Amino acid sequence: MCKRFTLIFSVVVFLLGTVISCEKQTVNPPQSEPDYDQLTENAVKEFLGFARTPRPGFHLDKAREYIKAFAQKNGWQWNRDTYGNCWFDVPATKGYEKYPNFILQGHMDMVCDAAPGEKLDFLKDVGTPHREGNLIWGEHMNLGADNGIGVGMMLAIVTSDIGHGPVRCLFTADEEVGMHGAANLDASTINSKYLVSLDGEQKGQLYRGCAGAITLQISDKFESEGAKAGLSKVTIGISGLKGGHSGRDIQDHRLSASVMTIKILDNLYEMFGARVMNINCGAVHNGIANNTEFSVAVKSSDTQAVLSQIQEIIDAFAVEYPKEKIERNLAAGEIGPEDYVCPSSGMEKILNVLKKLKYGVIEIEGNHVTKSSNISPVSLKDGEFSVKSMMRSDYNEWMLEQADYYLALGDSLKVKADVASGNPAWYSPTIYPMVAMLKEFYREALGHDIVDYRSQGGVEPAYFCQLRPDLQVTCFGPEINDAHTSKETLHIDDVPAVLKATVRTLQHVNELGE
């Protein structure tokens, strides 16, 4: 009897344990492996379609209309907030109805940069795609792969036949001009604790943090010099520099056209009393200036000596930066009666401002840049002077100190100084379960280890985490070279791994719970 009871008890315990374990076990719906080569082609197609839409920061109506039409074509409700962010929700496919909500995110705007010699209207003109092997870039100007390919991957994923739970595709506005869209996003828009931002630009890296940034603008107005007799105009044009992203590429110690402009102006003023007439240096605050054109007024008798001195300065830069291809164009001519010439007092004030600005890596810990500064653009037109300095750091306190310093500098020099924009630093010391899952899928897709990356460039998860403290978020994407320049190039062969890691995470996120 005792043995029989023991046997029955053992069977009952086993069956109960089996039932309990079955209740706890997550059963995924049947899944077929997508054709990632085809999915990649679809993502590139969607990207190039989106790239036909002009979309500089603060001018995104056409981009929103493009996404709205895409959503309505597929029967999905399109929404936008008061700032200009927009999104649509894709219902779960059959068998995935109980999966938790998931957010895919990218930004709509791009940094527009024309190729040397091109005169474009960024509100109307777009780049012409050129594809060669696994590379794609734009002719005439960049295509905006940052973050157009992220948008393209989102659109390709949700229109494919892969299984997934409910997905929100979120498209933020004005990221490149200060992350204003993310800063103005309502917390209710983040309807999931799982978010993947497809705004990365470096293969094999998974963002766990980013530097914060603050952009300062200093400006003033100067009357024109009255006496112009005996003066000639010397125009200096410099192009061909690498330029690049002022966060990602600053650690490469690339030559800035802003630095060259400041050096030449300072030298010519000290040696010849030259006065600046105009400056058009750099294009955007978050790009390393790769070109400049400016003119100075000098005594006609000094013209040849000035030209020789400029050549010597540029030659010295060429020796110091042998990897840069410096193209120069110098010309001398007459000054017209209506031409603007900055007076000596204005010239001194401009130089005092420019020489106090910082460029390049300021502090580095190991191989990681923790503090940096960029100078771009620099402008002087009809006496209106303006310069922007974008400082990045892992430490919010340092950026605030720099802001205080430059605001005080503006007061002391009697020029207008303003904080134009800023975004917070972000770091996630914990690798959350969703991020760990995606990291493993990404490692399998690439076949090598993934780097946990803290970017010197800013990314929008810094704001998303503030809206939802329990958010499990990361950012990654395919390799993009020379972002924020006309030479921007997308590596198409890096796209499949990003798609595979994203899709597999969507298909297995239910294993993490709500």
Regions found by a protein language model. Name each.
Residues 17-21:
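C-terminal motif of bacterial Sec signal peptides marking the signal peptidase cleavage site
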Residues 27-135:
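Acidic/His- and Gly-rich active-site-bordering loop/insert found
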Residues 35-39, 370-392, 439-504:
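Zn-dependent metallopeptidase/amidohydrolase metal-coordination segment
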Residues 108-110, 170-178, 199-203, 242, ...:
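Acidic, glycine-rich active-site loops and adjacent beta-strand->loop/helix elements
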Residues 188, 254-271, 300-306, 348-363, ...:
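His/Asp/Glu-rich mid-to-C-terminal helical/loop segments that flank catalytic regions of hydrolases
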Residues 26-29, 96-193, 230-233, 347, ...:
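Active-site metal-coordination/substrate-binding segment of hydrolases
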Residues 249, 254-279, 403, 416, ...:
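Active-site-adjacent substrate-binding region
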Residues 126-127, 132-137, 176-177, 182-392:
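Midchain, well-structured core segments that form catalytic/ion-binding scaffolds
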